[in-house]
Each structure stands twice: as C-alpha cells, then as structure tokens.
Amino acid sequence: MAHYKAADSKREQFRRYLEKSGVLDTLTKVLVALYEEPEKPTSALDFLKHHLGAATPENPEIELLRLELAEMKEKYEATVEENKKLKAKLVQYEPPQEEKRAE
C-alpha cells in the first residue's frame, strides 16, 4: 500500500509540474483547436507538432545559428568552386598519374 501512495505522490508532483510550466494549458489549447477544426487534417500528429512548435517563442540563439549556417554554406560553396579551379590548373602543370608511374 505504501508503494501505491509513493507512485501516486510522484504522479501528483509531476501533474503539478506540468500545470506550473504551462504544458497542460498549451496541450489543452492545441487539442481544442484540433477538435474545433472544421476539416480535420490528415495527420493529427503533424497538426499538433505545427501548433506546439508555433506556441514556443523563437530562441534568439537559433536565429544566430541559422545565420551562421548560411554563412558557412556560402563559404563551403566558394571553397568547392576554388577547389575545382585549382584542380583544373593542376592538371595543366602536372602529367597524369599513369605517366608518373611509368617513369
């Protein structure tokens, strides 16, 4: 019986935690929005993901990381292009690999 009360107490603590952090309220709002949707989406899970994702404020660090990622992609593309040009120049000045082995 004591084990049952301990598990019940943990559940109650967890429920209070979810209430205080706003999780239950947010989940309820999203589920109500799905319920009230005139045309139910084909994927309820996608609906939940979309609406839960929109409920959280955007972390400013995420935007900085997105900008950094875009810059790194540009640098990568420039490096790939430069690498192609340098390889083309190298072919002009070095004999093919088969000729080197024959020597």
UniProtKB/Swiss-Prot annotation:
InterPro entries: AMY1. The keyword Chaperone does not apply. The gene is Mycbp. Keywords: Cytoplasm, Nucleus, Transcription, Transcription regulation. Its main location: cytoplasm. It is found in: Cytoplasm; Nucleus. One of its GO terms (molecular function) is transcription coactivator activity. It comes from the Eukaryota. This is c-Myc-binding protein. Binds via its C-terminal region to the N-terminal region of MYC. Associates with AKAP1/S-AKAP84. Interacts with MYCBPAP. Interacts with CFAP91. Belongs to the AMY1 family. May control the transcriptional activity of MYC. Stimulates the activation of E box-dependent transcription by MYC. GO terms for biological process: regulation of DNA-templated transcription. Signal peptide: none annotated. The lineage of its organism: Eukaryota, Metazoa, Chordata, Craniata, Vertebrata.
